[in-house]
């Protein structure tokens, strides 16, 4: 191989920025939004309206940082598998454009930033953050040992909920745990849609997922999980006496779920991926319903 072709395969300097953006998924924000929406639900509900600006900023930045950290550790865990999966074979760690050492240093740096942010809240929230770190660090390895890595991901994507309540109210009431359970169910549903994209490749390399476990019952299980999500969110709405806008948002989420089932009915890869991406709007409409229900002028 010539020196020129080697340099093209392994760029240096600023030419490496796109690889680090891909590693942290900053070029594909869907995962960040799926983590952001339930965190915003919790912040608004805990504050009974618009949260204090500093707290909001801490959690918004924290979502970006921890999502990036989670992607780094995910690709590190999958570095020997990604090359065998069509969708992931060009990831920077799988191709060697980013080294394992660089990934470890980046992960540590992102965790330090996140810890610095949470230290601006209060001690109970700081203590809760250790569970968030444990979930983020262990999730990527679960797919080797269990068919339920999506449940661990759901817990990781939901842990901002009790942290938000603790930061604002210094307690984690029942409503927070119901919201967490709803978000876990929703996460397992949409990540099963995501896993349906890779199911054939995962079966070849021995990766486990709910999509592999559910098999031909995948659409039924996704529907049941989505129904559970709606029921748990409705329970939260009833307990907190949320107004009509919340129920409109919940109805819109239900309509979005119906649309997703039209997309995945033939289990085509592209359509399953579109259904996964569509969950951004599901989170948005629920947030809009909560925010408008708690808006003081409405």
From Swiss-Prot:
Q: Which organism is it from?
A: Chromohalobacter salexigens (strain ATCC BAA-138 / DSM 3043 / CIP 106854 / NCIMB 13768 / 1H11)
Recorded hits in HAMAP family, A to Z, give: UbiA
Say which family it is in.
Belongs to the UbiA prenyltransferase family.
| GO molecular function, a single term | 4-hydroxybenzoate polyprenyltransferase activity
Catalytic activity annotation: all-trans-octaprenyl diphosphate + 4-hydroxybenzoate = 4-hydroxy-3-(all-trans-octaprenyl)benzoate + diphosphate
| Keyword Magnesium attributed | yes
Enzyme Commission code? 2.5.1.39
Keyword terms of this UniProt record? Cell inner membrane, Cell membrane, Magnesium, Membrane, Transferase, Transmembrane, Transmembrane helix, Ubiquinone biosynthesis
What high-level taxonomic lineage is stated for the organism?
A: Bacteria, Pseudomonadati, Pseudomonadota, Gammaproteobacteria, Oceanospirillales
Which leading EC class covers this enzyme? transferase
* Originating gene: ubiA
Q: In which pathway does it act?
A: Cofactor biosynthesis; ubiquinone biosynthesis
Name used for this protein in its record? 4-hydroxybenzoate octaprenyltransferase
């Amino acid at each position: 191989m010539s020196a020129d072709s080697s340099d093209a395969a392994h760029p240096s300097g600023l030419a490496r920025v796109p690889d680090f953006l891909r590693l942290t998924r900053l070029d594909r924000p869907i995962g960040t939004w799926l983590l952001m929406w339930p965190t915003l639900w919790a912040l608004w509900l805990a504050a009974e309206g618009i949260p204090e600006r500093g707290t909001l900023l801490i959690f918004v930045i924290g979502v970006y940082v921890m999502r990036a950290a989670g992607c780094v550790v995910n690709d590190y865990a999958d570095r020997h598998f990604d090359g065998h999966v069509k969708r992931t074979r060009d990831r920077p760690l799988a191709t060697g454009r980013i080294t394992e050492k660089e990934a470890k240093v980046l992960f540590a740096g992102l965790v330090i930033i996140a810890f610095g942010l949470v230290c601006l809240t209060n001690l109970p929230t700081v203590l809760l953050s250790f569970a968030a770190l444990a979930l983020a660090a262990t999730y990527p390895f679960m797919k080797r040992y269990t068919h339920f890595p999506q449940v661990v991901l759901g817990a990781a994507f939901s842990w901002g909920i009790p942290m938000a309540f603790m930061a604002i109210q210094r307690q984690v009431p029942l409503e927070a745990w119901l919201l967490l359970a709803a978000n876990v169910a929703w996460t397992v549903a949409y990540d099963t849609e995501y896993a349906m994209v890779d199911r054939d490749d995962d079966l070849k390399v021995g990766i486990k997922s709910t999509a592999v476990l559910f098999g031909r019952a995948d659409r039924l299980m996704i529907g049941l999980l989505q129904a559970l999500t709606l029921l748990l969110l409705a329970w939260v709405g009833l307990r907190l006496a949320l107004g009509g806008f919340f129920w409109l948002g919940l109805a819109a989420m239900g309509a979005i779920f119906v649309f997703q089932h039209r997309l995945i009915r033939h289990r085509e890869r592209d359509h399953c991926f579109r259904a996964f991406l569509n969950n951004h709007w599901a989170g948005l409409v629920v947030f809009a319903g909560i925010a408008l229900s708690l808006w003081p002028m409405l």
